[in-house]
Amino acid sequence: MLGPFKAAAIVGIGVSLTSFAPPPVFSAAALKALDPSRIATLFCGARRAGSSLAQNLLVAAAFAAPASEGRPIPLFPDLATSPFPVSTDKDNARRYFSQGLLLTYGFNHAGAVRSFREAQRLDRDCAMCWWGEAVALGPNINAPMDERDREAALDAMDRAMALRSTSTPMERALIEAVAKRYSRDPGSDRAALDANYADAMLDVARRFPGDDDVAVLTAEAVMNTSPWNYWEADKKTSVGRSGEAVRLVETVLSRNPGHVQANHLYIHLVEASDPQRAEAAADRLANPSAPSAAHLVHMPGHIYQLRGRHADSIRVNIA
C-alpha cells in the first residue's frame, strides 16, 4: 500500500524525495497504483474517493496549511522569479507575487493565497497582489469554488479594483476581467460567472496577444467553463471553446516552450485526445524549473502512462 507521503507526491502535495538508485523493477500492481490516469479519475475532476489510495491522499492533504494559516509562508527561491512585470517597488512583494502566481499555476491554491497575502502585507498598494488572491480563490478544473471563500474573493477583487488606477493597462485589464468572475448575490449562477470571466479574458488576450501569462490565464479561464471535458467522443472535435484554449497554449509553446503553465495546461488539454501531442511538454516539465511546485513535477506522468513510459511516470511521481 502506498503511504500518505508517497501518495502525496503523485498529485503534487509538497513531498520531495531527491533521488533513488538503482532503477527499480515495478510490478504490474505498482504500475496500476501509480497510473496517473487512474488517480485523475479519483481526484482530478472526480467528486468522490473510496479507495485506500484516496484515503492516503486525503491524509497527505491535511498536512497542507490552509490559506488562513497565521504564519507567513516562506519564499521558495525557485518560485520567486516569475518574469511577470508586476507593478510594485517592493522587491519582496514582487517575489511573493511571483510565488503566488506559480503556485496558482501549480494548483496549490492555498499556498498561492498565502503568498499573495504576504505580498499585500509588504505593499498594500499593489493592486495585482489583491488580483492574485481573487484569482486563486476561484474555481479550477479540479474543484468548484468553496462558497466559504466568496467574501474573501470579493474583498480582494474590490481592493484590486480600487487600486487599479496606478497599474499598467494590461494589469487593469486583468483586474477588470476578474471582477466579472464574482457576484455579491449568493444565488448567482456560477457557470454563467465562469463564462463571463472567460469572455472577459478572451478580450484581454486579444488586446495583449504577445503576453504569455495573459494567454495561459485566458486558456485556464476557458477550461474552467468545461472542466475535464474538452473533446467529443471522436477525440478530435473540441467541446465548446476548448479549441480556443488549445490555440492559446500552443501559441505560447511555439514562442516560449519553457513556460511551465503552458506545458501544464497542454497536458490537461490533449491527454484525452492525442497524448503524443503533449509528450514534448511532459519532457520539459520532467526537468522542472520550479521543483517546489510539486503538482507540476507530477504532471508528465499523465502523458508518460498513456504513452507506455511507465518507469518515467513513476520517476516523476516520486521525484
Where in the sequence are the language-model features?
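Sequence context surrounding c-type heme c attachment/ligation sites in exported
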Residues: 294
